[in-house]
From Swiss-Prot:
Lineage: Eukaryota, Metazoa, Ecdysozoa, Nematoda, Chromadorea
Chain segments carrying region Triple-helical region: 128-157, 176-202, 206-235, 240-266, 269-304
Name of the protein: Cuticle collagen 12
Family matches, as InterPro entries: Col_cuticle_N, Collagen
Composition-biased stretches (Low complexity): 127-157, 183-204, 219-234, 256-266, 276-295
Signal peptide span: 1-36
Gene: col-12
Length: 316
């Protein structure tokens, strides 16, 4: 039983849409997780640092109020109940640190003095000092031209008896560029005929002309008288010119072998001139990795001088 090709094509198209939708949703979810998770982690860390700073500040305030209460109790002579340590134990604050804070409570201290600046501890403000200033950035693109300014106020009127001269103006007006050529005008009327010119006088004779072509041949003349008889002729033998070379003859028999020649006495020649430079060789193999360098010196411990002063109530 064969299936309908149209039905198969429809199912393929529907499955293609479902696959495309699934891939798009998974891609968007992945990108959202990549961007949202670090942002959420950073926000939670910021909130934790802020809450830790606020909790330490509230703890500092409560310790101050408790010291005031103890001082008032000592002055009035009324014995009160013992302060519980559950709150401080939950925050990791020991009695020695409370005693140290109570002894130094009378002086005004910044937040950095409360949290301590010993090695391995964090400042109460939850952030480090500002780093060094970075290098200046590149110059930006030039901005657009500004709008034209408003026209200036009119000048004072000149007096009636004052005349404008070349020295009256305080600015130099250069000559403007020449204007375009105007349209050609209409043709003017014909001028009056001029006066007759002076006569040239008698002309000088010119040079002789070139020779003319030769004339036609004349009529042949009449026969002349018969001449005297000549001397008898002589027979002279003259050698003829040599004829062309004949064909080459057949080769003759081979001759006897000659005597062996003497050994040569020539010296070997000197070295020839230096040849051209060869092609550059292939790059060498990379060298072995160097040994790791020594560890650097430990950096200075951070201080809490950059933290803002505590937000205490008036009178503290």
């Amino acid at each position: 039983m064969t299936e309908d090709p149209k039905q198969i094509a429809q199912e393929t198209e529907s499955l293609r849409k479902v696959a495309f939708f699934g891939i798009a949703v998974s891609t968007i979810a992945t990108l959202t997780a990549i961007i949202a998770v670090p942002m959420l982690y950073n926000y939670m860390q910021h909130v934790q640092s802020s809450l830790q700073s606020e909790v330490e500040f509230c703890q500092h305030r409560s310790n101050g109020l408790w010291d005031e209460y103890k001082r008032f109790q000592g002055v009035s002579g009324v014995e009160g109940r013992i302060k519980r340590d559950a709150y401080h134990r939950s925050l990791g604050v020991s009695g020695a640190s409370r005693k140290a804070r109570r002894q130094s409570y009378g002086n005004d201290a910044a937040v950095g003095g409360f949290g301590g600046s010993s090695g391995g501890s964090c400042c109460s403000c939850g952030s480090g000092a500002a780093g060094p200033a970075g290098s200046p950035g590149q110059d930006g693109a030039p901005g657009n031209d500004g709008a034209p300014g408003a026209p200036g106020n009119p000048g004072q009127d000149a007096s009636e008896d004052q005349t404008a001269g070349p020295d009256s103006f305080c600015f130099d007006c250069p000559a403007g560029p020449p204007g375009p050529s105007g349209a050609p005008g209409q043709k003017g009327p014909s001028g009056a005929p001029g006066a007759p010119g002076q006569s040239g006088g008698a002309a000088l004779p010119g040079p002789p002309g070139p020779a003319g072509p030769p004339g036609p041949a004349g009529q042949p003349g009449s026969n002349g008288n018969a001449g005297a008889p000549g001397a008898p002729g002589q027979v002279v033998d003259v050698p003829g010119t040599p004829g062309p070379a004949g064909p080459p003859g057949s080769p003759g028999p081979a001759g006897a072998p000659g005597q062996p020649g003497q050994a040569g006495s020539s010296q070997p020649g000197g070295p020839g001139p230096q040849g051209d430079a060869g092609a550059p060789g292939a790059p060498g193999a990379p060298g072995q990795a160097g040994a790791p360098g020594q560890d650097g010196e430990s950096g200075s411990e951070g201080a809490c001088d950059h933290c803002p002063p505590p937000r205490t109530a008036p009178g503290y």
